[in-house]
């Protein structure tokens, strides 16, 4: 299910973050941390309500994106198809085109034979048509090139900020999510310059300074994701007590580690 897919992505990102923490490479961690936030919020949004429909919308969206890309690539006489033929050759392009058509047919069959997927697919079409009418009313261009995200289907959520509001994390949007975008869009390279008495120097690539804030953020949002999953699974009292002890232990370790990292900043 999609909630398990989210958990897998979160686990992969935490594993990558552990490697970077061990190396003292905190600057590149920001890229993964931002994605971790997106996955954590997405998981919470799915588990909050209408879980089956939202999970289905998330699962289907990736296939929709692949098919949209394939239709552009394999459209005969299009600029993209001409470039693909030059790169792959006519024979390989034709074979890949047939493979794409089989995938497209299989995906449509999956929707047609699954009641939940069919319901979500119909809701998606309605959402696209609704946005097209709105764009037409506002006289916007490219009304036939409507793109929607999985979280828009059957909800009033139109963007990631609104999804953060739905999950109670809107206060983090500007300060954390927006702030982390500097690393994503390569706008923070100048921060690696350190001014000292005798000139300017580049900081070390593996620099532990200011890592405490990133580490704290990773810990907090990882535990938030786990907490939401535990509540959704509705485990018995013994399991909940065990999880509570685990969280308390993590918090103690987090405080100790951050205090140690802050000492590095002071030095």
Model-derived features with residue positions:
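Secondary-shell segments that build the walls of catalytic and ion/ligand-binding clefts
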Residues: 64-215, 225-267
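Inter-repeat boundary and helix-capping residues of tandem alpha-helical solenoids
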Residues: 6-7, 169
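Short alpha-helical linear motifs
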Residues: 53-60, 200-202, 219-222
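Short, hydrophobic, well-ordered secondary-structure elements
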Residues: 7-46, 174-181, 219-226
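Long, hydrophobic, well-ordered secondary-structure blocks that form the structural core
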Residues: 16, 26-77
